[in-house]
């Protein structure tokens, strides 16, 4: 089985890495799709995000990284994926992800596998990391080392 785990990953967090690690234990091949999202104002370029994701998942067997520019279901078809992986944090993720799962299934027939966030990562989001980092917060326990370094360079305090 091959599955896609996608997101804007601006930046990738240890919660994302945890989902990829756990998905790779269950699924033969996992493609981490770094999505272009024109609706979001990112702090890192697409090239930087792809580099961060590649670095963060480099040691996880069966994982590759690719750029997603367009509909996720079209990307899944392109990649020959059987399923979409989505992580669920504490709070309101379930309702949204269930709606998206039904839409993706209706549009393409592709199934969605929902993985709950690990207890230590259930409240982490990229937007929270960006907010904390730009205000001088220490986010080192929530992001991979390469991302932490880049955040310190982007937001020196």
Swiss-Prot record:
Can you tell me which residues bind ATP? Answer: 8-9, 16, 87-89, 97, 121-127
Site described as Transition state stabilizer, positions?
Answer: 16
State which pathway it belongs to. Answer: Cofactor biosynthesis; coenzyme A biosynthesis; CoA from (R)-pantothenate: step 4/5
Chemical reaction(s) catalysed: (R)-4'-phosphopantetheine + ATP + H(+) = 3'-dephospho-CoA + diphosphate
Question: What Pfam families does this protein map onto?
Answer: CTP_transf_like
Instruction: Identify the gene encoding this protein.
Output: coaD
Q: Which organism is it from?
A: Cutibacterium acnes (strain DSM 16379 / KPA171202)
Ranked from the top, the taxonomy reads: Bacteria, Bacillati, Actinomycetota, Actinomycetes, Propionibacteriales
Q: Which family does it belong to?
A: Belongs to the bacterial CoaD family.
- What GO terms fall under cellular component here? cytoplasm
Spell out the subcellular localization from the entry.
Answer: Cytoplasm
Q: Where does substrate bind?
A: 8, 40, 72, 86
GO biological process, alphabetically ordered: coenzyme A biosynthetic process
Q: What is its main location?
A: cytoplasm
Q: Which cysteines are joined by disulfide bonds?
A: none
The name this protein carries in UniProt is Phosphopantetheine adenylyltransferase
Q: Outline the subunit composition.
A: Homohexamer.
List the SUPFAM superfamilies hit by this protein, alphabetically: Nucleotidylyl transferase (SSF52374)
